[in-house]
Amino acid sequence: GYTGEEMKLVNETRKILDAPQLMIAPTTVRVPVFTCHSVAVNAETEIKVGAERARELFARFPGLKVWDDPAEQRYPMPVAVEGQDDCWVGRVREDLSHPSALSFWVVGDQLRKGAATNAVQIAELLLDS
């Protein structure tokens, strides 16, 4: 069955995206790193996006940086992004099992983005509106 942490991921994602029927099948694993959460994502889209277009779209998001060099096998690792406010995405590729699916890897320092920095950024958005 699913763990409590996995169900929290399902429920919170659906709530944040206001998508109660969103299909999510997470697996969480505790690994020995001091900071940073990492997630391997497999996402099916309504229309085919393609890896290059996905990289372009990811690069437009404030607070998300693309670090993806498949030829050199360079992509975000927790030790490299620790202490940074941004989240990082890499390993962007078209999924071989579905024509409109992508797989990618995301890393972020939860002590920055998941906590203090996020609170400040939300407050700034509220003050600007």
Locate predicted features.
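C-terminal helical cap and adjacent loop that interface with cofactors, partners, or active-site loops
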Residues: 44-46, 59, 77-129
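Structural motif
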Residues: 21-24, 65, 102-103
